[in-house]
């Protein structure tokens, strides 16, 4: 036997089992099936699987008991404490949600404050079929799928969503108020599809989209690739008749309007870029002076007035 193997067999760290201790590990003449007895049989595997299944079943039953206990506690706490919190006696929403008819004004309180699952399903159907994108209907469906949520939580969420929908309706009707307010200040105003439009110069602008006057006439539309540069040296393009800064476009639009290599441009586009560079170099001071003079023109006065009004209305100032 080699010296290294001899040392390993004699070491105290991993002693080799000998004589009586080694019985059953290796096949011998007296016990030829010793090694096969050590591997588990099919019967052992089946017993182990049965034990695992019983353990999982017990865990599931324990979880079900815990969920039911939690649900019962939630319902008890809702019946005891939530009547005063949500003012269920006087609220029309609570009458609609709970489906119990008008509540009496006396101190009588009904026993069943939490609606049944059928009532919740009917309420969800009512919301979903009237408007499929309604957030309250989606919330009710989520409550039906995830039954661990307590009804008091759902009720507060529905109240919040109702308030949000009301605020959204109010905001959508405030365009008329904007028009009246801007007309009262002496501006030429008209109502657009989504917001007010104010006339500055010979064009209509949304409040907040105005970024200073054009270098060229507005009828002179910018070329598709190059765009134009305004008095603030910001590149802008025309989108749906509005002046939009190039940096405020979404990434795909910027990518679509990116300038191709010089060799691909037509002669007209090359001349246009050269002219803009020429204006940058030779008209820089003149453009700055024109920017200062602009505030004293009629268009500048309208723009400043609109800026103050939009700052008061929207809580922010749009610096051109």
UniProtKB/Swiss-Prot annotation:
InterPro entries in the record: MMTV_SAg
GO CC annotation, single: membrane
Subcellular location: Membrane
Membrane topology qualifier: Single-pass type II membrane protein
Segments in the Extracellular topological domain: 66-320
Entry annotated with the keyword Transmembrane: yes
Keyword Lipid biosynthesis: no
Positions bearing carbohydrate: 79-80, 89, 93, 131, 146
Keyword annotations from UniProtKB, A to Z: Glycoprotein, Membrane, Signal-anchor, Superantigen, Transmembrane, Transmembrane helix
Transmembrane annotation, as ranges: 45-65
Cytoplasmic side: 1-44
Signal peptide bounds: none
Protein role: Superantigen.
Note: This protein is coded in the long terminal repeat (LTR).
Family: Belongs to the mouse mammary tumor virus PR73 superantigen family.
Protein name: Protein PR73 3'-endogenous
Organism: Mouse mammary tumor virus (strain GR) (MMTV)
């Amino acid at each position: 036997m080699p010296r290294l193997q001899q040392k390993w067999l004699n070491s105290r760290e991993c002693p080799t089992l000998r004589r009586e201790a080694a019985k059953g590990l290796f096949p011998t003449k007296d016990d030829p099936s010793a090694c096969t007895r050590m591997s588990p049989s099919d019967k052992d595997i089946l017993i182990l699987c049965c034990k695992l299944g019983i353990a999982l079943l017990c865990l599931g039953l324990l979880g079900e008991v815990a969920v039911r206990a939690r649900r019962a506690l939630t319902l008890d706490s809702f019946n005891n404490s939530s009547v005063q919190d949500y003012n269920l006696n006087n609220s029309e929403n609570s009458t609609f949600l709970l489906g119990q008819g008008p509540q009496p004004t006396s101190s009588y309180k009904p026993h069943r404050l939490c609606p049944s699952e059928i009532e919740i399903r009917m309420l969800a159907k009512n919301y979903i079929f009237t408007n499929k994108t309604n957030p309250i209907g989606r919330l009710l469906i989520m409550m039906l799928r995830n039954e661990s949520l307590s009804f008091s939580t759902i009720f507060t969420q529905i109240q919040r969503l109702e308030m949000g929908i009301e605020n959204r309706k109010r905001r959508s009707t405030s365009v008329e108020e904007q028009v009246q307010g801007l007309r009262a200040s002496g501006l030429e105003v008209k109502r657009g599809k989504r917001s007010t439009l104010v006339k500055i110069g010979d064009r209509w602008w949304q409040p907040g989209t105005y970024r200073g006057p054009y270098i060229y006439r507005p009828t002179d539309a910018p070329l598709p690739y190059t765009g134009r540069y305004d008095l603030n040296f910001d590149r802008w393009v025309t989108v749906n008749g509005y002046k939009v800064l190039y940096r405020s476009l979404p990434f795909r639009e910027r990518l679509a309007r990116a300038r191709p290599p010089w060799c691909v441009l037509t002669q007209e586009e090359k001349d246009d870029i050269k002219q803009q560079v020429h204006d940058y170099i030779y008209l820089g001071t003149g453009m700055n002076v024109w920017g200062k003079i602009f505030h004293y023109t009629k268009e500048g006065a309208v723009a400043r007035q609109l800026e103050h009004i939009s700052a008061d209305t929207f809580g922010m100032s749009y610096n051109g």
